[in-house]
A protein has these predicted regions:
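Short conserved beta-strand and strand-loop elements enriched in small hydrophobics
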Residues: 62-83, 129
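Residue microenvironments linked to proteolytic maturation
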Residues: 8-16, 22-24, 29-34, 71-72, ...
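Polar/acidic, low-complexity leader/linker segments enriched in S/T/G and N/D
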Residues: 1-65
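Residue-level detector of intrinsically disordered, flexible termini
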Residues: 38-40, 57, 70, 87, ...
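Short, surface-exposed beta-strand/loop "edge" segments at domain boundaries and coil↔beta transitions
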Residues: 38-46, 78-84, 113-115
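A broad, low-specificity signal for short, low-complexity segments enriched in glycine/proline
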Residues: 53-67, 89-95, 120-121
Length: 181
């Protein structure tokens, strides 16, 4: 099966007070944290990401992008598998696992797209964080019949995490970080 662009979203909710506290505690920067992705659970797009695939890709992403401060993401999902620097809005600062949840800390950048993202958060807009990657999927036979569920295959490659308006993964709420990062 050929690789396709796979995008999956988790919602983020942040209060105005949390935003203001994060900015104050982080020298003017908005830093948020929460669930980036979930393994071994069906999301709203009908996809299941096997834990071993996500663990491998998260480690690779952290080693190659996060540690070198180039884990950039965009505001909205592009049609491309390449991060466009003109649309960069945030940078992932760290990632770690809590059971099947991939948690992360994200800095909103002072770029045009980052400033839009910050104002959307300040206005109380509910946003989602979404993984973007390339890979193939195979149908999963559910006990109750064909329901369209697919499993992401071993060829999956994680590209970025983007902020979007339409979440697909349950429970990914980002909250501001109120301590210096």
């Amino acid at each position: 099966m050929s690789k396709q662009l796979l995008v999956d979203v988790r919602p983020f909710e942040i209060s105005r007070q949390q935003i203001d506290e994060s900015i104050k505690e982080n020298n003017g920067r908005l830093v948020v944290k929460g669930v980036l992705q979930r393994a071994a659970a069906k999301n709203q797009n009908g996809r299941i990401y096997p834990r071993e695939v996500l663990v491998r890709e998260a480690k690779k992403y952290e080693d190659v992008n996060v540690r070198e401060r180039r884990a950039l993401g965009e505001l909205d999902h592009p049609e491309s598998s390449v991060v466009n620097l003109n649309n960069a809005s945030h940078n992932v600062l760290e990632m770690h696992w809590d059971n099947d949840d991939l948690l992360g800390t994200v800095e909103v950048l002072s770029t045009p797209a980052g400033n839009i993202l910050k104002e959307l958060f300040r206005s109380g807009i509910k946003l989602g964080i979404s993984s973007r990657g390339l890979g193939s999927v195979e149908p999963v036979n559910e006990a109750d019949g064909e329901d369209g569920t697919v499993e992401v295959q071993d060829d999956f490659e994680l590209i970025a995490f983007d902020f979007v308006s339409n979440p697909s993964t349950h429970g990914a709420f980002m909250r501001p970080v109120n301590e210096s990062v």
